[in-house]
Amino acid sequence: AASLHKSYASELNVVGWAMGGTVTRMADWLRYIDGTGGAGFAVAALGGISSVDNDLQWVQDNLTPLGKIVLEKSKHSCMYKNLLEEAYKRFISDTYFQGGSAFFENSDAMYALNKYNLGADGSKVPSAPVFMFHARNDIVVPYAMAQGTARSWCQQGAQIRFTTYAGVEMGHTSAGIASLPDVLHF
């Protein structure tokens, strides 16, 4: 929302944004998370994007019977149920949709996913100040992704305050909780 504000809802008087644990490079993140304990996130992300983005419609069109079941269940389940049921599975595979094993080599797929990269398009830079936070030990979204986006946005003129939660106890969810006082103060 922060990167689309100028083109999507410019009439809103946004005075600041706060975000943390944010996926900023979709293809890289899908490659990273698929097959891990967080694979349920990949199911929800790819299912959601492919249902609304015509450039990824072929994912929906080429779902296997199992892929259709999994995506339909994910639409009606909370994220934690998706995480439990899809943990350590490789969703981006031929098991779930035809062409899945070659997904990351498909130039059309990469074009579509790269549209969701934050910080890459100079016309999509937050105009209001941004408070970004991320746990260095986040196993759901790699720290370097968020840090890279913050740097890119800063180089493009955005006002970014980036906070790192470095404790070993800090992960994807715990950093979100720990950041609440900073978010409210921001």
Placement of each model-derived feature along the sequence:
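C-terminal catalytic histidine-bearing segment of alpha/beta-hydrolase fold enzymes
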Residues: 31, 105, 110-113, 137, ...
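Short beta-strand/loop motif that positions the catalytic acidic residue
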Residues: 125-126, 130-138
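Hydrophobic/aromatic beta-strand patches that form the interior of the parallel beta-sheet core
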Residues: 18, 131-133, 163
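Extracellular/periplasmic catalytic domains that process cell-envelope and extracellular macromolecules
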Residues: 11, 122-126
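Short glycine-enriched nucleophile-adjacent loop
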Residues: 1-8
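Accessory cap/linker subdomain of secreted extracellular hydrolases
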Residues: 20-121
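A conserved short beta-strand
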Residues: 9-24
